[in-house]
Swiss-Prot record:
GO molecular function, one term: symporter activity
Signal peptide positions on this chain: none
Family of the protein in this entry: Belongs to the HAK/KUP transporter (TC 2.A.72) family.
UniProt name for this protein: Low affinity potassium transport system protein Kup
Transmembrane spans: 9-29, 49-69, 101-121, 137-157, 163-183, 213-233, 247-267, 276-296, 337-357, 363-383, 395-415, 419-439
Membrane topology type: Multi-pass membrane protein
Gene name in the database record: kup
Cell inner membrane listed as a keyword: yes
The UniProt record lists the keyword Transmembrane: yes
One Pfam family matching this protein: K_trans_C
InterPro entries the record matches: K+_transporter (IPR003855), K_trans_C (IPR053952), K_trans_N (IPR053951), Kup (IPR023051)
Amino acid sequence: MSTDNKQSLPALTLAAIGVVYGDIGTSPLYTLRECLSGQFGFGVERDAVFGFLSLIFWLLIFTVSIKYITFVMRADNAGEGGILTLMSLAGRNTSARMTSVLVILGLIGGSFFYGEVVITPAISVMSAIEGLEIIAPQLDTWIVPISIIVLTLLFVIQKHGTGMVGKLFAPIMLIWFLLLAVLGARSILDNPEVLQALNPYWAVHFFLQYKTVSFIALGAVVLSITGVEALYADMGHFGKLPIRVAWFSVVLPSLVLNYFGQGALLLKHPEAIKNPFFLLAPEWALIPMLIIATLATVIASQAVISGVFSLTRQAVRLGYLSPMRIIHTSEMESGQIYIPFINWLLYVSVVIVIVSFEHSSNLAAAYGIAVTGTMVLTSILSATVARKNWHWNKLFVGLMLVAFLCIDIPLFSANLDKIVSGGWLPLSLGLVMFTVMTTWKSERFRLLRRMHEHGNSLEAMISSLEKSPPVRVPGTAVYMSRALNVIPFALLHNLKHNKVLHERVILLTLRTEDAPYVHNVRRVQIEQLSPSFWRVVASYGWRETPNVEEVFHRCGLEGLSCRMMETSFFMSHESLIIGKRPWYLRLRGKLYLLLQRNALRAPDQFEIPPNRVIELGTQVEI
């Protein structure tokens, strides 16, 4: 390792603490309280405390440390992670039928994330503000308004980017984790008996003693690992090593100490179950703890918001969501983006959730079902990658998958009990997003197939135009072409109605590759089809935003000189008609029409000056 790398590792590790671990790092605010609140038919009993602590500890070890940190993070696409990346990797070396199944699993996982992302900011911030109940019980009616005010400020500043305040995230979260560790260790020293719960015997004993109820109680235990997907999703920002170092050196020890510290407190003072996290702190430290807890939960919420922006961009670029405005808030960091529509849709949803559920304990009933569902899908997809891409031994992969699912499926099944009490919310939101993504992808494919049914050969048409050319006009015309060997509709209609052709015609195709970035050397491919026709294929990764001006610059370097303000861009605008279909497909067609009407137009999507664009309409039945 070079000196530079040695210097950068601590900085990247600190940055990872500030972003990646915000969600899982604020789980101690509410996890143990929900486990022992009495909802499962038992209160703060010694065996229950030991059982829950043992389950939480071994879940952190097995699911986070072994499954995600050690195994899942091996599956990267040019350093990038996330459920859609895993879906893409899993489908590379499989049959078409198997790929379709894997795509559906990946989209379900992505949809689950959208469902859970509405709950995370609400439960995190509310659980911090609820410290007011300990400091000043008379202010408990202000918890909901203050939570909304805090989150409103967070969503408002999104359009300005988080580059400046983001520099504060890491030191604040480091202070947070150190406080977790200190408060927990202080309580453990006062009652070291609690360390017996490190023995997995207590987890087994918990199931044997409480039987069926213990299985349902797993729905509360899973709160301790919510946010685990962020470790994999944010891998591209910081790299594997900093995330792993941060987990084992700071985050895991701090979480374990704090959970066991809360357990030690509850063994001596069962009445502290009202809010064991804040009651760990001495009375004089309650107000500072409330402030730092609020800041930590805001940072956790910011990480989730940034995550949903990144997932949305990836889904748009891969063709699963309609084009929408994506604003880059940093000239230095391509990952810092702002999507206005998603931002305000998420804000309204979060406010509705806070007003409806009123307390973090009520929200806890809705939390976890989407997380555990994603965990099941991640296990299946990552095992597929291990077998098909890495060519690991079939028996070993099978045993590993069984081991993962033996944890994931019971956790998911236990959370199904939450559907009536609130779990319906993330499931409903996830179902909506899955419907939207599959509708856009399938109907877009149907539309393109119909548009390409005319069957005219591009080469034959170009040859015919060169032999018997129409009237030529000076300048360059660019026709946006979705497929390489298909005549663009705009070109057909321009010849049909205007009966003219520019002196130079460029057929431009912008395509998204199965990689986060494409090197500038491979950005454009130029092919001269005839003396006056050129084909340009510009490739972008799914983390990049296509820019026609940049394409022209690269073309100039390759010998094809183009000037934006001397070029006319011809695009087709499709007016869609829904043909004869079964009723359910008609509904899907109407949803697609709605999505298309609200999609970002191509000139805005590719940053083409509006005064250089000519749109030619065509009617297509789908």
